[in-house]
Amino acid sequence: MMMMNYNFPYYQKLAEGVGCEKEVDFVSCYLSPEKFRLPEKMREVARRISERGKFRVINFKTKSELRKYAVKIGEAYNKTFVNNWEYYPLSEREIKFVIDQLIVNAVPKLYKIILYNDDVAGFLLGFPDISEALIRQKGHITPWGVVDFMLELNRTKWVSLNGAGVLPEYHGRGGNALMYYEMERTMIESKYKHAELTQVAETAVQM
């Protein structure tokens, strides 16, 4: 999955030179699995929320398990970002297309969904970062390049978290604490040495 595009520093001056103004910034945050630790208070909130039983986390072991929840994840994605500046809902056809593309190379253990009773309340989607392979292939897709991309999926030590959210109605009810708790667990328990939280709008203050 492609994450944030890279813009050279001089792009800003060029754009401003023809009268463009900044609308919103999207930021990327580096997280070190070795150093990223939630405050104990937030961990305690997450544990209590889990113990009450209304919120629960679904972990996946196989792609077939993931596919069963794929449509619900797509629907939750639409609802989660409804208040974001760039929000535009995906159609059913677009949801299916995105799901089909993602599941091909999905690492099930990097996908988590949070249920409230039986409804999807939030999700955390992680993707192995194959940027090094893209750099080696200079952006070209060749037969060898495809092999390199596939090998990089297992070789990379970087994971990109580009899909983390809790539906607005569950904010302030423990959903966010549970999501961050799962983010911490995912990074600690995985093989990855580096993590990046990508494409976060500066207006998304709840993050």
Which residue ranges define each predicted feature?
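Short beta-strand segments
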Residues: Y30, I113-L115, L125, E196-Q199
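Conserved GNAT acetyl-CoA-binding A-motif
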Residues: M1-M2, W158-V159, M187-A201
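Short alpha-helical functional segments enriched in proximate histidine and acidic residues
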Residues: V18, T80, T186
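Conserved acetyl-CoA-binding loop-helix of GNAT-fold acetyltransferases
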Residues: W158, N162-L167, H171-M187
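Low-complexity, glycine/alanine/valine/leucine- and proline-rich hydrophobic stretches
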Residues: I135-L151, L178-M187, L197, A201
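Acyl-donor-binding surface of acyltransferase catalytic domains
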Residues: M1-K61
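Conserved beta-strand-loop-alpha-helix junction that forms the acyl-donor binding cleft
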Residues: M1-Y10, S32, L167-P168, L197-M207
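A conserved beta-strand-loop-helix scaffold within acyl/acetyltransferase catalytic domains
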Residues: F60, E65-V166
